[in-house]
């Protein structure tokens, strides 16, 4: 009979311990219930990107001197730079510049090491397409600046969301 009594005591201790764990979990759950939601409704609401966000690369054709530093510092040799040497002015003339964003890892080395600052990172991150060949941007597509999230009147940014009053 003694083992049966110790069994009931152990069962009682385990029940109390389980109730305490459930109570602690409930307290944590209730403390999280009055917080601001982390998720957003993506197509209709967008978060503001940080100042140093590494999005799509913007290219300024007029500033490029075809030095190919961007190709040399790229870990995957991604930018394609076509140029022609002009003998009369003894300089390279840029013919074509393209980047395939399906392969790009957005490391930012090309932007950082460009001597003429003709490359910059934008806040555009919506690059999804149905055809992977549409991700190959030439100098015309790279030169278009995206519409900033702040200026897009169809989008509610995180700053425009209603505030939850804390106690």
Swiss-Prot record:
Keywords in alphabetical order: 4Fe-4S, Chloroplast, Iron, Iron-sulfur, Membrane, Metal-binding, NAD, NADP, Plastid, Plastoquinone, Quinone, Repeat, Thylakoid, Translocase
EC number(s) on file: 7.1.1.-
The record's free-text note on cofactor binding: Binds 2 [4Fe-4S] clusters per subunit.
MF GO annotations: 4 iron, 4 sulfur cluster binding; iron ion binding; NADH dehydrogenase (ubiquinone) activity; quinone binding
Top-level taxon: Eukaryota
Domain annotation 4Fe-4S ferredoxin-type: ranges: 55-84, 95-124
Cofactor(s) needed for function: [4Fe-4S] cluster
Chain residues that bind [4Fe-4S] cluster 1: 64, 67, 70, 114
Membrane topology: Peripheral membrane protein
Residues annotated for [4Fe-4S] cluster 2 binding in this entry: 74, 104, 107, 110
Family, per entry: Belongs to the complex I 23 kDa subunit family.
Protein purpose: NDH shuttles electrons from NAD(P)H:plastoquinone, via FMN and iron-sulfur (Fe-S) centers, to quinones in the photosynthetic chain and possibly in a chloroplast respiratory chain. The immediate electron acceptor for the enzyme in this species is believed to be plastoquinone. Couples the redox reaction to proton translocation, and thus conserves the redox energy in a proton gradient.
The protein's name in its UniProt record: NAD(P)H-quinone oxidoreductase subunit I, chloroplastic
Organism: Pelargonium hortorum
Protein's gene: ndhI
